[in-house]
């Protein structure tokens, strides 16, 4: 009986083992092998500073772009303002230049008017006194019209008088207006027995008369009297007692030199009070 129980237990054990084995095999066949599970861990803490850094850089770039845009806008405004300012300054400069030119023209006109008045007053003083310190001529020279004259008492040939006048920075007497003729005649009357050379001559007998500066003579002002008493050629002209004669150029006559008068200085018109008292 015990042998039977033992046999049965053995069979059960065998069956149990078989069952366990089959169960295990069935479980092994039905259970799929589990794949290796990949762990999805949270982002590493090292990426967070990088992301923050990139974000910060982006913000800095945006701020920089905004600042550049603002600077460009300000520069554009300043550029336009500068252009407007330059245009305004150029306009003002043009207006100032025109005003300056206008003032210069007015100044020239005023200076001309002042000079005219000063010359007129000085001439009145000169004619009354016979000489005045306001005269535009140097001492011993006579003022008439626009010129200064000097009547020398030394007698020279026509050519010597020519070079003498040149040495005095002047030329020989030239009569091209009626006023000049009257002035020269009045001076010749004062020296009744003396004649004065003029700057009129002709290169050869029969040719045209020319003044010293090459200007041709016109007979409308005066007539040249041929002096038949001169033994040689009569190609130079002298004035005697208001009359015009042709003379031999080698004869000795007094010299008359003339040169352009200077400008009358308005300050020279001032008359000291003591001078006015003496006149009274």
Swiss-Prot record:
Cellular compartments per GO CC: plasma membrane
Signal peptide, first to last residue: none
Disulfide bonds: 165-257, 236-249
UniProt source species: Homo sapiens (Human)
Region (Disordered): 1-44
Comp. bias (Polar residues): 18-30
Cell compartment(s), UniProt: Membrane
Gene: CLEC1A
Protein name as catalogued: C-type lectin domain family 1 member A
């Amino acid at each position: 009986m015990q042998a039977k129980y033992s046999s049965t237990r053995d069979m059960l054990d065998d069956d149990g083992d078989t069952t366990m084995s089959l169960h295990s095999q069935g479980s092994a066949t039905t259970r799929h092998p589990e794949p290796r599970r990949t762990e999805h861990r949270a982002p590493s803490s090292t990426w967070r500073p990088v992301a923050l850094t990139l974000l910060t850089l982006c913000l800095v770039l945006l701020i920089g772009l905004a600042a550049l845009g603002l600077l460009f806008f300000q520069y554009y405004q300043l550029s336009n303002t500068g252009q407007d300012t330059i245009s305004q300054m150029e306009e003002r400069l043009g207006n100032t230049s025109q005003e300056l030119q206008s003032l210069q023209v007015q100044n020239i006109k005023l200076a001309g008017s002042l000079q005219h008045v000063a010359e007129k007053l000085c001439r009145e003083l000169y004619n009354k006194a016979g000489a005045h310190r306001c005269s535009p001529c140097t001492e011993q020279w006579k003022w008439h019209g626009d010129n200064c004259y000097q009547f020398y008492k030394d007698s020279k040939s026509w050519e010597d008088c020519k070079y003498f006048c040149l040495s005095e920075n002047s030329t020989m007497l030239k009569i091209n207006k009626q006023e000049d003729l009257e002035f020269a005649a009045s001076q010749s009357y004062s020296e009744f027995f003396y004649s004065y050379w003029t700057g009129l001559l002709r290169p050869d007998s029969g040719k045209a008369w020319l003044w010293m500066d090459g200007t041709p003579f016109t007979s409308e002002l005066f007539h040249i009297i041929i002096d038949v008493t001169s033994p040689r050629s009569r190609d130079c002209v002298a004035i005697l007692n208001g009359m015009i004669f042709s003379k031999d150029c080698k004869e000795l006559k007094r010299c008359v030199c003339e040169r352009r008068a200077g400008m009358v200085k308005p300050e020279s018109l001032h008359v000291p009070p003591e001078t006015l008292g003496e006149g009274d």
